[in-house]
Amino acid sequence: GKVRIIEEKQIAKSRADVMLVLEEKLIGVEIKSDADTYARLARQVKDYNKFFDYNYVVVGSSHSKHIEEHVPEYWGIIEAISKEESVEFNVLREPEINKRAQRTYKMKRKLSILWRPELSHIQEINGMPKYKQRSKDFVITKIMEKVPWDLLHRQISEELFQRDYNTISEAIKEWRSSNKH
């Protein structure tokens, strides 16, 4: 299947090092190099759990023995080992689905990753009203009420697959001008 990699994505009060977009799920990846500490990790874990279906932490070899004390048992753990001219990755633990966040809350968070033109496209393909002059939060709630969630997971991923960072500012301007009174 398709995969899109988005680096340094703001999520709540943290920044996800890597967000993997798959056809029906979002995966968060936190990277802790040998030079990093665990100072922000508790906050990052909470924030990742609000958005992602699965989470991994990738650690340097100095963290591999103790990282499991710092992340939940359902997070995957990957050890990155530096070789002379390459890096070797060892999966120490596979992730399990993140069921910790309330389902409704997590869907709302996932939709909040999308920009207004992307939400507008989801409304359009599902035959929904445009809700001009309504807040993003209102639109997200209406989408959640109207669109079956198994379909919505795929539509969120499709919007993120199609996202073009080179043209989005123009698309947002266009959306704003077409949604004025």
Where would I find each of the regions flagged by the language model?
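Active-site metal-binding core of divalent-cation-utilizing nuclease and nuclease-like domains
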Residues: G1-E23, I27, K142
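Short catalytic-loop micro-motif centered on adjacent basic/acidic residues
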Residues: G28-E30, Y56-V57
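A conserved mid-domain beta-alpha-beta active-site/ligand-binding segment of alpha/beta enzyme cores
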Residues: S86-F161
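Short acidic-glycine loop/turn motifs at beta-strand connectors
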Residues: L22-E24, I81-E85
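Conserved beta-strand termini and adjacent loop/short-helix elements that scaffold enzyme active sites
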Residues: E8, A80-K83, L92
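Acidic, metal-dependent phosphodiester-chemistry machinery of nucleic-acid enzymes
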Residues: G1, D150-H181
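Catalytic cores of nucleic-acid endonucleases
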Residues: D36-I81
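Short beta-strand-loop-alpha-helix junction that forms the active-site gateway
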Residues: K25, I31-Y38
